[in-house]
Structure formats: C-alpha cells, structure tokens
Curated annotation (Swiss-Prot):
GO terms for molecular function: rRNA binding; structural constituent of ribosome. GO terms for biological process: translation. This is Small ribosomal subunit protein uS8. Gene3D superfamilies: 3.30.1370.30, 3.30.1490.10. It comes from the Bacteria. GO terms for cellular component: ribonucleoprotein complex; ribosome. Belongs to the universal ribosomal protein uS8 family. One of the primary rRNA binding proteins, it binds directly to 16S rRNA central domain where it helps coordinate assembly of the platform of the 30S subunit. PROSITE patterns: RIBOSOMAL_S8. Part of the 30S ribosomal subunit. Contacts proteins S5 and S12. SUPFAM superfamilies: Ribosomal protein S8. Keywords: Ribonucleoprotein, Ribosomal protein, RNA-binding, rRNA-binding. It comes from Desulforudis audaxviator (strain MP104C).
Length: 131
C-alpha cells in the first residue's frame, strides 16, 4: 500500500524521463488521469492511454523529447504531501520559474494549472510543480 500515490506517479515519470524511456505505466486513478490530461494539454508529454488490466487499470504515458533527445520535462516536484499539506489562497497562487513551468492545484472546481486558477480567481491545494 502506498502512502502517497501522487508522489509515486511523479517519481515513475521522473525516472522514465531520466532514463529516456518512450513510455511508462502508472496505476490508474481519477486524480492521476486529471494530472496526465494537464501534462498533455501543457505539452509535457506526447499522449496517454488508459489500459484496462482487469483491476484498477493503468495509465500508459508516452513521454516527449526534443530533436536532439533533450528532455521536455526538466523537473517535477511534489509540494503538498500527506504529512504537510500546502494550500494557496487566490492571491497566493504560485508561479513556477516566472511562468516557464506550471503549478498544479486541486481546487473546488477540480484539478487545474496555476494559470487557470488565477483566471477563475480561486486557490486550493498545491499538488506539484512541473518545469
């Protein structure tokens, strides 16, 4: 049993990215699907598919690299952890690397990026930073 499934999700992506793997698989859940959709929309991954394995399912993530095999994802960092939750009000929504990266928040209106949260005028739990 995992104590922090989101940290495991980010670690699997980080490890596959560091090893230049084309794909990685993570156990499926609603929040992981939402995080993966944001990664796709923001251009950090090529795509993903949900694979039914007869249990909870898996998400197969297709990683993205540049022309000369440079990594598109430079870094991933878990911010709000089970032992220390981190929340941001609507005025405190963080900017990652001056807008070059994204912060992903869990808000009352669902999982969204820092830009979307600022546009909606809401805050929430800061899940992670990706740059």
């Amino acid at each position: 049993m995992l104590t922090d499934p989101i940290a495991d999700y980010l670690t699997r992506i980080r490890n596959a990215n560091t090893a230049f793997h084309e794909t990685t698989e993570v156990p499926a859940s609603g929040i992981k699907k939402a995080l993966t959709e944001i990664l796709k929309e923001e251009g950090f991954i090529r795509g993903f598919e949900v694979v039914d394995d007869g249990k909870q399912g898996k998400i197969r993530i297709y990683l993205k690299y540049g022309k000369n095999k440079e990594r598109v994802i430079t870094g991933l960092k878990r911010i709000s952890k089970p032992g220390l939750r981190v929340y941001a009000g609507k005025e405190e929504v963080p900017r990652v690397l001056g807008g070059l990266g994204i912060a992903i928040l869990s808000t009352s209106k669902g999982i969204m990026t820092d830009k979307e949260a600022r546009k909606e005028g809401i805050g929430g739990e800061v899940i992670c930073y990706i740059w």
